[in-house]
Amino acid sequence: MTKLPSLTGKDILSILKKLGFEIKRQKGSHVFLQNPDVRATVFPIHSGETIGPGLMAKILRDVNMTKEEFYQLLK
């Protein structure tokens, strides 16, 4: 299993935008993204703070991706 590097909310946002996700709404620091397949996820964007492993696992489940698939997008 591949261990992902520490990523910020902005890093994850840019990767998900490449996959076709769009920001549907934002309340405070929490961003709600959705793609045309109606998959959606919510995560915070705090400047300088990284997303923890538990929240990263939730985001990957929400967008129906494995760590390996996500890691390929980082390269």
Residue ranges of each PLM-predicted region?
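A short, structured beta-strand/loop element
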Residues: 23-54
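N-terminal first-folded block
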Residues: 1-27
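N-terminal low-complexity, intrinsically disordered patches enriched in charged
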Residues: 18, 37-38, 73
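Generic anion/oxyanion-binding catalytic loop in active/binding sites
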Residues: 1, 45, 59
